[in-house]
């Protein structure tokens, strides 16, 4: 492992001293290591990134999401040093950075391949690449009103309901927006997709888990509605068609996981006790 990328979120508290320390830790493990620094993911999706052996993300979970989308087609593994608030995906704290880098070069880690989603818009040129690691969300526009949605799974009608929106999430995204919408926490290596309605106007409409190979069609039934598509809570697009198709992408996010990190411990400390942290916000 000689080619290392570092993707820095410039909105976070990352001093030059921190970056110098990381360079030092890397070169202590491999004096010949070549380090390429990216700022706010700019240039990360270029073909040259294919040569990287791993990318370290300095930021929060949102920075991980952006990095995953940029690198998906290159199969480059990533891991995060948390400089955000929650740090569920960016699970390495700054004080553990040196240990993580040492384990990286010793090969003391595993790689988890996480499902990603793709979205096709009916009748729209596919030049836009709608990839998501967490979720793809279809909601109403600016007006505060509910919208009527019809859901088809593998071209078979599933249900129709009115709601604020619809979330289609991966197992990775099950601890994000869909959790707030009443969806279950899904173990990350399961091959499933989740549909979670947002504030449905019915007591009988609940989240559902589907086979990971399912094709999900969401139709907006009122012609005067201009739905909005949101990718991982970061990319935003007004949709001029009334139907979107969401399915599993051929690309996966490759997350580096170190052996001293336990999923359930992270779940307990980062999610279960989140309410205590929020009291002071």
UniProtKB/Swiss-Prot annotation:
Coiled coil, from the record: none
Enzyme Commission number(s): 2.7.1.23
Localization per record: Cytoplasm
GO molecular function, one term: NAD+ kinase activity
Cofactors named for this entry: a divalent metal cation
Sorted UniProt keywords: ATP-binding, Cytoplasm, Kinase, NAD, NADP, Nucleotide-binding, Transferase
HAMAP family cross-referenced by the UniProt entry: NAD_kinase (MF_00361)
Role summary: Involved in the regulation of the intracellular balance of NAD and NADP, and is a key enzyme in the biosynthesis of NADP. Catalyzes specifically the phosphorylation on 2'-hydroxyl of the adenosine moiety of NAD to yield NADP.
PANTHER family, per database record: NAD KINASE (PTHR20275:SF0)
Protein name listed in UniProt: NAD kinase
Source organism of the structure: Clostridium botulinum (strain 657 / Type Ba4)
Taxonomic path: Bacteria, Bacillati, Bacillota, Clostridia, Eubacteriales
